[in-house]
Regions:
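N-terminal Sec-pathway targeting helices
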Residues: 2-17
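Soluble catalytic regions of membrane-associated enzymes that act on cell-envelope
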Residues: 87
């Protein structure tokens, strides 16, 4: 009996020693490598960092829908006719024009009042291009009138999307209301590493992004670790 008990005690002691040893090593490993793990968390670097190693892919991307998902309104990005073009819908006429290098629309807006709005960004490219208008408190709203890039003409989206098409200013779907708010309804899919930065108390937005459009990292993930890896000599790459 004493021999058997001694064996049990020896086995239990050995198991306890192994368990304590394992967890001691695990604790040491975590403490020793905690800083390294933190340093290796990849960060967004921006789509332009891809050009050096992937010029062909970047060139193809530049012509894609992703690259044109959202851009600053300019002569190169705007496809619509802003040469004093007009569109009449439900008895209301909207006019599109330029002053200098800025794009404007005179249309029915808040409270149903006709007034001038500045176009800040293009939104998409085909089969239609929409336009974003800046408002107070960091808001951007999607203009309901879009440019048909296949037939080269203006059209009001309400004619095809909404019923009734004659939306009133108190309707949630009206273009200056929440339904057409870029910050909360559209932004995350059209820009890369976007942060809305909404202040619920002040009811303001302060949106930030890595790239204004959908860059390589939007699908492939943050690129800093890959860039670091690509910068190593070939025989040193893990």
């Amino acid at each position: 009996m004493r021999i058997v008990n001694s064996r049990y005690i020896l086995i239990i002691g050995l198991v306890a020693f192994l368990i304590v040893g394992f967890f001691s090593y695990l604790l040491w490993f975590l403490v020793e490598n905690s800083g390294k793990v933190q340093d290796e968390v990849p960060e967004f670097a921006g789509g332009k960092t891809c050009i050096g190693c992937h010029p062909k892919e970047y060139s193809l991307w530049k012509e894609s829908d992703h690259a044109n998902a959202m851009l600053i309104a300019s002569d190169s990005s705007v496809k619509g006719d802003f040469n004093n073009a007009e569109l009449t819908f439900n008895g209301k006429t909207s006019r599109f024009y330029k002053r200098g290098n800025k794009f404007y629309v005179f249309t029915q807006g808040e409270g149903g009042i006709q007034k001038e709005y500045r176009i800040a960004y293009t939104f998409g490219i085909r089969p239609l291009q929409q336009y974003l208008v800046p408002f107070e408190n960091g808001r951007y709203q999607c203009l309901p009138i879009a440019w048909d890039t296949r037939n080269n003409k203006w059209f009001n989206m309400a004619a095809m999307v909404y019923s009734p098409s004659d939306l009133q200013p108190d309707n949630w779907l009206y273009w200056t209301n929440q339904s057409q708010n870029w910050n909360s309804m559209c932004a995350e899919c059209h820009s890369t590493n976007l942060h809305k930065n909404f202040d619920p108390v002040a009811k303001t937005y302060n949106a930030t992004w890595q790239d204004i459009n959908v860059n390589c990292e939007a699908c492939h993930g943050p690129g800093s670790s890959h860039i670091k890896w690509a910068g190593l000599p070939v025989d040193e790459r893990p």
